[in-house]
């Protein structure tokens, strides 16, 4: 459900997407998010996420996309650690929830995500719904700080017409967008 920033797709959607993408030798990253709204989850929602992770792995997802924050918009280390056993060592991507983390704490968050085993962070570079070009300097700062320890994937306003310029200006390794293809 893109209207709320993405939620966990149905069993059937994951199954069909995996079949289709794997035929084309493209990897599948499955969003694990039980609802729209904020990224603060209670115990019941964490159990739902554990089950969804197990189903996504069973259906041959190649990556899992998660975004868990505390009430004060910091990485929910405890919640992530609860989910880790169910991930079965699949590569983990931190959702654009990263943009809700205060700018002053984002470098610490990168370190925490590296320590938790995440391989990629999806970010717009700002919690504001602004033009991504306004965030180029901050995105470059994040890419430089990550220094290859974790991939910074830029998103939110990336198109087929601008992704190459954004990659060049930020140094990001990858871009994400519904308007790239």
Which residues fall in each region the model found?
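Glycine-rich phosphate-binding active-site loops on the catalytic face of alpha/beta enzymes
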Residues: 1-6, 55-72, 116-132, 158, ...
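A general structural motif
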Residues: 23-27, 61, 89, 149, ...
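Structural beta-sheet core signal
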Residues: 30-32, 66, 94, 154
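Beta-hairpin (beta-strand-turn-beta-strand) motif
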Residues: 33-35, 69, 97
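Catalytic cores of alpha/beta
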Residues: 37-58, 92, 99-116, 137-154, ...
């Amino acid at each position: 459900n893109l209207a709320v920033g993405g939620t966990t797709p149905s069993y059937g959607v994951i199954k069909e997407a995996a079949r289709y993408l794997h035929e084309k030798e493209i990897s599948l990253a499955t969003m694990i998010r039980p609802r729209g709204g904020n990224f603060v989850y209670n115990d019941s929602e964490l159990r739902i996420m554990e089950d969804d992770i197990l189903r996504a792995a069973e259906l041959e997802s190649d990556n899992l996309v998660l975004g868990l924050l505390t009430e004060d918009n910091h990485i929910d280390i405890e919640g992530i650690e609860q989910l880790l056993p169910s991930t079965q060592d699949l590569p983990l991507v931190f959702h654009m929830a990263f943009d809700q983390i205060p700018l002053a704490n984002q470098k610490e968050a990168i370190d925490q995500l590296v320590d938790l085993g995440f391989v990629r962070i999806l970010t717009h570079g700002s919690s504001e719904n602004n033009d991504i070009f306004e965030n180029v300097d901050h995105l470059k700062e994040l890419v430089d700080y990550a220094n290859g320890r974790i991939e910074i994937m830029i998103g939110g306003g990336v198109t087929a017409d601008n992704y190459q310029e954004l990659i060049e200006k930020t140094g990001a390794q990858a871009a994400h967008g519904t308007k790239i293809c």
